[in-house]
Amino acid sequence: MERRPYAIGIAAILGAALSWSTAGLLFKLIDLPPLKISLYRSLFSCLFLALVAGRGWREVRVSPGTLGVILSYAFTVDLFVIANKSTTAANAILLQSTAPIWVILFGALLERRRPRAADILAVGGALVGLLLVLAERVGPTGGRGNLVALTSGLCFGLMMIAMRRARATPLLHTLALGNLAAVLLALPWVWPDFALTGGQLFYLVLLGAGQLGVGYVLLTVAIRRLPALEVALFALLEPVLNPVWVFLARGERPGAMVMAGGAIVVLVIAFHALATARRYAGADR
C-alpha cells in the first residue's frame, strides 16, 4: 500500500471520528426539542451531502436495499437525537454503538448466516456491557433515553444489513436521501414551530453540515484508501471521545458502570473486527 494514499485515508477516518464525536456536546448546547434539532440537522446535512455528491443521481437504484438504507438511517438519526436529550451523552453513544452486534443477530435471523465462535463471543460480551450501562441510574428520563438509544443502534444495524443489498447505489446520494427522510419523519412533531435564534441556527448548521455531513464525506475518502478493518477500528474513537467532550465542556460525568460497560462494548467490537479480518486474510491465502 502506497504511503500517501494510506496517510490520506488515516487522516480522513480520524477526521470523521472526531467530527462525529462532537454530536453529544452540540446537542447539549442547543436548547430545543430533540425532533426540532433533528429536523434541522438532517435538513442541513441533506443539502450539504447533495451539494458534495453533485451529479450521479441517475445511478441511484430504487430497490429494497436502497429503501432499507434510507428508512433505517432516518430512524437512526432521529432516535439518536432524542436519546441524547433524554439520557447522558455517554449512554446514548455507547448504546448506539451496539450496531455491529445487531448486524450479527440480524445476519443469523434474516440472512440465515451461521454465527461463528467470534460472533457468539461478541454478542455475549456486548450483552454484559449493555447490562452494566443500563444498570446505571441516570435521572427520571434516563431509562427511556437508554431504550431509545438502544433502538437507534438496532436501526443502525438494520442500515448496515441493507447496505449489503444497495452497493450499486452511491453512498453520499443515499445518505442525502436518508437525511431527507429523517426531516419528513420529524416534521409532524415540529410543525408549525420552525422559529430559531441566530445562535441555534449556527449550531444546527454546524451539526448538519459539519458534524454529520463532513464526517460522512471523510468516511467515503477513507473507505477508498484503507482496509475495512482499519476504518472500523479508527471509527471506534467516536464513542470514546463523545462523552469526553461533554465532560470537559459541561461536566457531565459518566458513572463507573457506564464506563466499564462502554469499555467492554468497544473492546468486543474491536475484537470482532480483528477476528473477521483474520478470517478473510486466511481465506485469501
What kind of feature is each model-predicted range?
Residues 60-64, 93-96, 112-132, 139-146, ...:
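Loop-to-transmembrane alpha-helix entry segments
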Residues 92-98, 163-181, 212-248:
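Helix-helix packing/entry segments at the starts of transmembrane helices
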Residues 19, 56-91, 95-96, 132, ...:
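Specific transmembrane alpha-helical segments of multi-pass solute transporters/efflux pumps
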Residues 49, 73, 105, 115-135, ...:
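Hydrophobic transmembrane alpha-helices of multi-pass small-molecule transport proteins
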Residues 2, 42, 135, 236-285:
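C-terminal-most transmembrane helix of multi-pass membrane proteins
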Residues 29-75, 102-106, 155-159, 175-192, ...:
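Transmembrane alpha-helices of multi-pass small-molecule transport proteins
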Residues 1-38, 71, 79, 124, ...:
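Glycine-/small-residue-enriched transmembrane alpha-helix faces in small-molecule transporters
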Residues 1-15, 45-68, 114-120, 138-144, ...:
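Membrane-interface interhelical linkers
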